[in-house]
A protein has these predicted regions:
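A short, flexible helix-boundary coil/loop motif
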Residues: 163-169
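Helix-centered, glycine/charged polyanion-binding patches within enzymatic domains
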Residues: 65-66, 71-145
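Polybasic low-complexity intrinsically disordered regions
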Residues: 1-88, 92, 148-154, 162
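Short, charged/polar low-complexity linear motifs in solvent-exposed/disordered segments
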Residues: 58-61, 142-144, 168
Length: 169
């Protein structure tokens, strides 16, 4: 975050974190996406230093039939069951200590990851079509508002052919 402001301060609501040897400052965007339609139904913004498992309750709306997630969500099965009682949990299994995982589990994780890849499509449209690169505002609330409006437009963009077909019929 820039310090080119009157206070010469970084945004106090955003924090820094490290991934490998690289340091990042800012916020993280977590989205919930319908696995069939690919449309984003929820978006949560957290500071960069918050673990990915914490916004799970805000990402689930309760009517899910299946929940997909990476191995960071593997320890959150109870939380997922409490928030979405009718949903089957399809989170990836973690590898054992030493990194060994049998081929059957690896094949299941690969199949789950193919479905999970649909979560990345709204991010691609947000970045490539709408040109989202950096945050514009100080504070998480303003940036969340901008991102929610952007994801509403992303959903319209993703279903534009269907909408045009119904409008001309």
């Amino acid at each position: 975050s820039s310090t080119k402001n009157a206070d010469k301060q970084r945004d106090p609501e955003m924090h820094q974190t490290r991934k490998g040897q690289q340091w990042y400052f800012g916020m993280k965007l977590h989205i919930g996406v319908d696995s069939r339609s690919g449309l984003a139904h929820s978006a949560v913004v957290t500071p960069a230093n918050v673990h990915d498992k914490h916004p799970i309750p805000q990402l689930l709306h309760g009517a899910e039939q299946r929940v997909y997630g990476d191995s960071a969500y593997a320890s959150q099965k109870d939380l997922i069951q409490a928030k979405a009682p009718g949903a089957k949990d399809f989170t990836n299994q973690r590898s054992r200590k030493g990194g060994h995982i049998d081929e059957a589990v690896r094949a299941k994780n690969r199949t789950k990851s193919r479905v999970r890849a649909r979560v990345e499509h709204p991010f691609r449209i947000l970045k490539c079509v709408f040109g989202f690169r950096k945050v514009c505002y100080r504070g998480i609330a303003k940036n969340l508002n901008r991102l929610q409006v952007s994801f509403a437009l992303v959903n319209l963009y993703m279903k534009r052919r269907t909408l045009i077909r119904y409008a001309t019929a």
